[in-house]
Design a protein with these regions (language model features):
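C-terminal motif of bacterial Sec signal peptides marking the signal peptidase cleavage site
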Residues: 29-30
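Structural detector for short beta-strands of small beta-barrel domains
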Residues: 148-166
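Short, charged beta-turn/beta-strand-edge "cap" motif at the junction between a beta-strand
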Residues: 163-165, 202-211
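OB-fold (S1/OB) nucleic-acid-binding surfaces
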Residues: 165-180
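Short nucleic-acid-contacting surface segments enriched for D/E, G, S/T with interspersed K/R
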Residues: 185-201
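OB-fold/S1-family single-stranded nucleic acid-binding modules
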Residues: 206-230
Length: 230
């Protein structure tokens, strides 16, 4: 599932440091939007160490969020799933695709108190320390705040299969032509030239423009959650 852009993470970091700083400004201007975001949204950002697509579903008073960290150059792909009832965190579930793989699960009651925790590394069950739990809770709140800003700022993630005419068949079955810059197009074409199958691409769209996020041989649609079952 590792889907980083080999050899291209530095240019992307340069672009996305500016874009992510600007996403903070989006939160300040989001109040001017009249329409509310749909219940199921996909967004994301590029951090210092990798790309992070985010899927989110808001149902009544519950927020369900899934993020996938894909490292630029080194490290392990990690999926992080969170649930909140109102503003109270109720679930943390992490899958770290390292060697050996690591799985972490923690549940919290209606008052936010820990009710269950387990860490499994290579099939061996372990307990989590209080410091580890505090760190995971902190990360959960950070990704929630980031998701809030991106959602209100109308930053949308799109992904699918790239075609020779520079169009993409998205995971939803639409055919789109991303408004990407020449560097992004050239990078996709270089990656495509070294692949026997159509590469997958992921990009972000916002009122301020579009930016390439990820390119890989693997099928991004295979692990994209669906609104009805998420």
């Amino acid at each position: 599932m590792n889907s980083f852009i080999e050899g291209a993470y530095q240019p992307l970091l340069s672009v996305w440091r500016r874009a992510f700083l600007f996403s903070g400004a989006l939160l300040l201007t989001a109040c001017s939007h009249n329409a509310s975001p749909p219940p199921f949204t996909a967004s994301g950002f590029a951090g210092d160490h990798g790309a992070v697509p985010i899927w989110r579903k808001d149902t009544n008073d519950e927020v369900h969020l899934l993020s996938v960290f894909s490292p630029w150059h080194s490290g392990s792909t990690t999926t992080s799933e969170y649930r909140w009832q109102g503003d109270t965190l109720s679930l943390i579930e992490l899958n770290i695709y390292s060697k050996p793989p690591e799985h972490i699960r923690a549940r919290f009651d209606a008052h936010g108190e820990l009710s269950f925790m387990q860490r499994e590394v290579g099939g061996q069950k372990q307990q989590l320390s209080n410091d580890q739990i505090a760190l995971y809770r902190y990360r959960a709140e950070q990704i929630r705040q980031t998701s809030d800003a991106l959602r209100l700022g109308r930053v949308i993630l799109r992904q699918g299969r790239w075609h020779a005419d520079h169009t993409v068949t998205t995971c939803e079955g639409e055919t789109l032509k991303p408004d990407l810059d020449s560097w992004a197009i050239s990078h996709i074409e270089r990656r495509q030239n070294h692949s026997s199958v159509e590469v997958s691409v992921a990009w972000l769209e916002a009122p301020e423009g579009s930016q390439l996020l990820l390119v890989a041989n693997s099928d991004f649609c295979h692990w994209q959650p669906q609104a009805k079952t998420f």
